[in-house]
From Swiss-Prot:
Name the record gives this protein: Bis(5'-nucleosyl)-tetraphosphatase, symmetrical
Provenance organism: Pectobacterium atrosepticum (strain SCRI 1043 / ATCC BAA-672)
Enzyme class: hydrolase
EC number: 3.6.1.41
Cross-referenced CDD domains: MPP_ApaH
Function: Hydrolyzes diadenosine 5',5'''-P1,P4-tetraphosphate to yield ADP.
């Protein structure tokens, strides 16, 4: 029985299956953790959702910003952009079933036995783990409810960018969503900067990658995240693992076997080279 962590799939089904074949993944014995952004930009978003769903309880995934964007597009709240390559999914006969399954997936995973935490973008240094869990469950609760279109309509935006326990309502949900699915840089006080997408070292000096600020979580737990492909899996402190290595942009799909911390990679087999930045979400 092994635990495998895989970075952002982004519709790259062939690469995902090839990576699983490298380790002879057995869904009856092994567990697959996915950092989110299953869909968009790559060629096979529909088949990725079908495949991941078919793996049942052997999968522990989190939602990413592109997954949330898909939910908003399907709900008629956001526009379907050709570069996201979602048409097959949106018009599939089982689209309703897949969308309803997707919106009931977690936004944060915590395993107390493994001392492992996973979120698509990371955990703000302003939170301890109990706070992160509360905020995650609030987002998950509304996403799985009949009120989810109201949340999807309100989630777009960069403010508020600073945590306060007094935050409430849609503003609180938006902040939490930005932390879990969009965050890269913070100011020294922990406030989110949602604009900078430069690589570390090229960002303004006032900004720090979230993982370079003192963490209230990473001392006791490992943190795995995706989202930030330009990191190429490098430059994070000990006990923090960046797993998005840009497969859909011609990079590779990365897997970490948690048991022995061994990495496996699968080079991209797709031809999508239209790297044009993340959607604003």
């Amino acid at each position: 029985m092994s635990t495998y962590l895989v970075g952002d799939v982004h519709g790259c089904l062939v690469e995902l299956k090839a990576l699983l074949a490298q380790v002879s993944f057995n869904p009856e014995q092994d567990t697959l953790w996915l950092t989110g952004d299953l869909v968009a930009r790559g060629p096979d978003s529909l088949q990725v959702l079908r495949f991941v769903r078919s793996l049942g309880s052997s999968v522990r995934m989190v939602l990413g910003n592109h997954d949330l964007h898909l939910l908003a597009v399907y709900a008629g709240i956001s526009r379907n952009k050709p570069k996201d390559r979602l048409n097959d999914l949106l018009t599939a006969p089982d689209a309703d079933e897949l969308i309803n399954w997707l919106r009931r997936q977690p936004i944060l995973q915590v395993d107390e036995d493994l001392k492992l935490v996973m979120a698509h973008a990371g955990i703000t240094p302003q939170w301890d783990l109990p706070t992160a869990l509360v905020c995650a469950r609030e987002v998950e609760s509304i996403l799985s409810s009949d009120s989810y279109p109201l949340f999807l309509d309100a989630m777009y935006g960069d403010m508020p960018n600073h945590w306060s326990p007094e935050l409430s309502g849609l503003a609180r949900l938006r902040f939490s969503t930005n932390v879990f699915t969009r965050m890269r840089y913070c100011f020294s006080g922990g406030q989110l900067d949602m604009l900078c997408k430069e690589q570390p070292g090229q960002a303004p000096s006032l900004l720090k990658p979230w993982f370079d600020l003192p963490s209230q979580v990473a001392g006791e737990y490992a943190i795995a995240f995706g989202h930030w492909a330009s990191l190429e899996g490098k430059g994070t402190p000990e006990n923090i693992y960046a797993l998005d290595t840009g497969c859909c942009w011609g990079g590779e799909l990365t897997m970490l076997r948690w048991d022995d911390k061994r990495y496996f990679t699968q080079p991209s087999l797709s031809s999508n080279t239209e790297l044009s930045g993340d959607i604003t979400l």
